[in-house]
């Protein structure tokens, strides 16, 4: 049986599986069919949690004597939206002018397809690998991320698995293949502020207490001054207000409650705990120093709730992993990639607790968009980078 050496063929097989979270959609079955002929053992545990859908995952390993490299990623995708808006059907893997179209083409079935092809090519050329390679693939990255990578890592550890390094195949490049390797991620912390007032007629504000006055005051205290100016490896921490709501459609009524939600992406100046303390201190001062109605003695009354499980900031410093991948990228693309910590969170935030981890994949410009697509030349380029990395990593 021929091995899965062609990344475009691999990707087409994966795209044709409509694996919108939480559906497996046949994607893990297609991946298993690529891995087993190469001698991988494959297991597909299903994880459960209260009030969340069951999620099927895949863990595959090909064992050898030497270091253990994990490739991590996901085969689930976001919904395509209105399929009529697509140039080609989102699960058709249509090719036009050297470009493959389909949901998940870059995020991140393309990365999976390329790493499979890279391993297959290495085995065809060398017969074996001087170490162990595993695939840790979830179907829950685009969803709640509760029954996916975080549980799959623990499941594997309980079975005696350990890893020396990991690559996550997320689309790390902003504009062109070889732009950037992600060597860390900012932390993420979310919360909701609720201010309680007294409902009343807009024409008689002295009889009411407007919570909008309070919520804007508290929000303003979180926006200014800036939390920091950035660090050597990370950009400045940034808080965004994601919603403000009073649940009031009447224009002549002062609402009795207002809420504001926020998210902050933070750098290594902070831990989640120290940042929470800073936010609480700012809110306490703003609430103490201001009133819902001029002349009132009572400070602003508010509640603060945190979203569970904040993501912690991390930075990978493993010289072998970063250096080998950087050299591989340069050898194929001719340029030295930036070592970046920008962007949002990924499942690397879970893997960092088990082994050094970096992210490198395709160009992310069309991820989650209508007409998500990837150039076939980029698929070949990424496969060559991965193949060179595998050869050099295992020596």
Swiss-Prot record:
Reactions catalysed, as given in the entry: N-succinyl-(2S,6S)-2,6-diaminopimelate + H2O = (2S,6S)-2,6-diaminopimelate + succinate
Record-annotated membrane-spanning stretches: none
Domain of life of the organism encoding this protein: Bacteria
Binding site for Zn(2+) 1: 74, 107, 170
Keyword Transferase: no
InterPro entries: ArgE/DapE_CS, Bact_exopeptidase_dim_dom, DapE_proteobac, Peptidase_M20, Peptidase_M20_dimer, Peptidase_M20A
UniProt entry keywords in alphabetical sequence: Amino-acid biosynthesis, Cobalt, Diaminopimelate biosynthesis, Hydrolase, Lysine biosynthesis, Metal-binding, Zinc
Gene Ontology BP terms: diaminopimelate biosynthetic process; L-arginine biosynthetic process; lysine biosynthetic process via diaminopimelate
GO MF term (any one): acetylornithine deacetylase activity
Active-site residues, as the UniProt record annotates them: 76, 141 (proton acceptor)
Pfam short name (any one): Peptidase_M20
Free-text cofactor note: Binds 2 Zn(2+) or Co(2+) ions per subunit.
Binding site for Zn(2+) 2: 107, 142, 368
Pathway annotation: Amino-acid biosynthesis; L-lysine biosynthesis via DAP pathway; LL-2,6-diaminopimelate from (S)-tetrahydrodipicolinate (succinylase route): step 3/3
UniProt cofactor(s): Zn(2+); Co(2+)
Enzyme Commission code: 3.5.1.18
NCBIfam families per the UniProt record, alphabetical: dapE_proteo, PRK13009.1
Biological role stated in the UniProt entry: Catalyzes the hydrolysis of N-succinyl-L,L-diaminopimelic acid (SDAP), forming succinate and LL-2,6-diaminopimelate (DAP), an intermediate involved in the bacterial biosynthesis of lysine and meso-diaminopimelic acid, an essential component of bacterial cell walls.
Family, per entry: Belongs to the peptidase M20A family. DapE subfamily.
Description of how the protein assembles with itself and partners: Homodimer.
Protein name: Succinyl-diaminopimelate desuccinylase
Source lineage: Bacteria, Pseudomonadati, Pseudomonadota, Alphaproteobacteria, Hyphomicrobiales
